Amino acid sequence: MLLSRFREAVGFLELRYRLAENSLVVEVAQVAPDELAQEPTCSLRAHRAAGSKCSRRMRTFFQWDDHDVMNNWSSSKDLASDSRYTEKSIARLAARASRAFHEMTPIRSEPSEPGRVYRKISYGPLLDVFFLDMRSYRGPNGPNLETELTDRSRILGRDQVRWLKGALAGSDAVWKIIASDMPLALVVWDDAAAKTGSDATSNGENGAPKGREMEIADLLRFIKSSKIKNTVWLTADVHYTAAHYYNPGMAKFQDFEPFWEFVSGPIHSGTFGPNELDMTFGPELRFIKAPTKDQGQNLPPSMGLQFFGLIDISGTTEQMTVRLMDRDDHELYRVVLDPQSCR
């Protein structure tokens, strides 16, 4: 009866519900049950009010990933048999998503490439943040086992790598945070059910770099040879939180300096994981919080497995303190990083 009355009250709104921990979770969205937001106005209409309130309270910087267009999107995505989509062109859907993204999250325009997402944000002498775009320039998702670095085997693309190398080399900040769409060593299948294809960098072979791993290996080698210190990677995409320490001594590819990568997400979405680690770059799992086998997958936010991260940099010691938190503001993990002398 309660559900029936609620459905009448919301009218055209979709009502979805499920049972989680013996509690009813009600989710309301401004679309019909089988409707997809394929036009920019759909997403803007649904999110403008909430986004405006958030923007008034805090400074926020954005980068995009697959779900701004669709799950695991790349040029190889085939929608021919997907009846949910009346628009079958991935390029057209990506263009619409890009327009909506930039209208909702204004980013200073780059004259040489309007609509560019990758950029650097400076926070004075202690911090530069480098936002990457691992979607727009990647080759098609596939086995990710190429042995030659070409446009098809890249995930960042030539121009973005050239920009990132130059920006890192020219940075005078003590700390250089690289905000990456996707983790470097977690295996993310393009088809999760069949466990085939690769949506991320790692291919799951645990061997010498192949496919997209070659581009990352080249970047890590450059950071080492250029004596660029104090790089820290922040990432998400996967729906849980973790701390990875990349140790050359444990890696198949060893020509890089050790570094940390912190994974934190989601803030309000289904919780999945954990994902397998690929040992090409020698990741050590220092911390993880993800669903247990008994809990299952796609857990609702009401289960409490929602995460975010906090970073503080001391103005006196220049130490970086990284904390992984849950949605109830409980500290799950903390590590203090000492800066290395730059150059």
List where the protein language model places each region.
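Metal-dependent phosphoester/phosphodiester hydrolase catalytic core
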Residues: 1-343
